[in-house]
């Protein structure tokens, strides 16, 4: 009714369309209409009745709308989801909270750059140690050091702070045996030369030759020089009537 009153109060003019064969074929316009019908529309404006025209077109519009908008049968409802197994409990979908959003690329790089540095080399999380002894070398006590020398030291400067048994190498023993074969007693000059050649000290050369001479005498079953000299001195110092310390002559 509101639309009808609007059309009555306003000077409504029926839209003018050019004549077309489609309109005549579909009987939308009467066949007896002529081009003068469109030209004389304004003269018949006072006697135009929009209610009749609206009522005449309404059934066609409603029928077309009903024919185009005819809904089909409703789709079947989706099947319900299968129930979970008895051993598992249903879990609700986890939705990310507002505070757990991923950081921006710039914030991500700042977080990586501001990460704490790795701990020092000697710190152990299970056994924390003081900061002043973090990278300190382990203490080596005298009893932990190796006493026997099994390799030739070219940077040997001579002299030892503590007496120790020396383990000579095969090359050193071979050179000492060759020198002992030609001369069982060494002079100071020759001892220094051998010590520098074999990277040993003069004391080590002296002790080795002493031990080697004792072994040589033992192998050749020679009497000890000290015992022999002591017996000779005792025999020479006896009384004149008892030669060689024996009983007196009758």
UniProtKB/Swiss-Prot annotation:
Q: What positions does the DNA-binding region cover?
A: 161-220
Signal peptide boundaries = none
Chief localisation class: nucleus
The answer to whether the entry has keyword Iron-sulfur is no
Pfam families documented for this protein: Homeodomain
Q: GO terms for biological process?
A: anterior/posterior pattern specification; bone marrow development; definitive hemopoiesis; embryonic skeletal system morphogenesis; hematopoietic stem cell differentiation; hematopoietic stem cell proliferation; hemopoiesis; morphogenesis of an epithelial sheet
Q: Which GO terms describe its cellular component?
A: centrosome; nucleoplasm
Q: Where is the composition biased (Polar residues)?
A: 1-12
Q: Modified residue Phosphoserine is at which positions?
A: 89
Q: Which InterPro entries match?
A: Antp_homeobox_Deformed_sf, HD, HD_metazoa, Homeobox_antennapedia, Homeobox_Antennapedia_CS, Homeobox_CS, Homeodomain-like_sf
Q: Please state where this protein is localized.
A: Nucleus
Q: Where is the composition biased (Pro residues)?
A: 71-88, 240-250
Alphabetically list the UniProt keywords: Developmental protein, DNA-binding, Homeobox, Nucleus, Phosphoprotein, Transcription, Transcription regulation
Quick check: keyword Transcription regulation in the entry? yes
Q: Write out the ranges of the annotated region (Disordered).
A: 1-133, 219-250
What is known about what this protein does?
Sequence-specific transcription factor which is part of a developmental regulatory system that provides cells with specific positional identities on the anterior-posterior axis.
Family statement: Belongs to the Antp homeobox family. Deformed subfamily.
Q: What is this protein called?
A: Homeobox protein Hox-B4
Organism of derivation: Mus musculus
Q: Which gene encodes it?
A: Hoxb4
């Amino acid at each position: 009714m509101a639309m009808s009153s609007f059309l009555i109060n306003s000077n409504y003019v029926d839209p003018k369309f050019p004549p077309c064969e489609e309109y005549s074929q579909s009987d939308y316009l009467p066949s007896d209409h002529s081009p003068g019908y469109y030209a004389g529309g304004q003269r018949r404006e006072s006697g135009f009745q929009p209610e009749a025209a609206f009522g005449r077109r309404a059934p066609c519009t409603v029928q077309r709308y009903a024919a185009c908008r005819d809904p089909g049968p409703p789709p079947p409802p989706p099947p319900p989801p299968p129930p979970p197994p008895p051993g598992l409990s249903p879990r609700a979908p986890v939705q990310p909270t507002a505070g757990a959003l991923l950081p921006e690329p710039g914030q991500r790089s700042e977080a990586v750059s501001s990460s704490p540095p790795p701990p020092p080399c000697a710190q152990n999380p299970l056994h924390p140690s003081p900061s002043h002894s973090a990278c300190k070398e382990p203490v080596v006590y005298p009893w932990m050091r190796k006493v026997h020398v099994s390799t030739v030291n070219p940077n040997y400067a001579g002299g030892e702070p503590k007496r120790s048994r020396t383990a000579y190498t095969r090359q050193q023993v071979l050179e000492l045996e060759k020198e002992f074969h030609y001369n069982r007693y060494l002079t100071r000059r020759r001892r220094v030369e051998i010590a520098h050649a074999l990277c040993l000290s003069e004391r080590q050369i002296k002790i080795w030759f002493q031990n080697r001479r004792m072994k040589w005498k033992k192998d050749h079953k020679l009497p000890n020089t000290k015992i022999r000299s002591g017996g000779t001195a005792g025999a020479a110092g006896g009384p004149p009537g008892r030669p060689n310390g024996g009983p007196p002559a009758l």
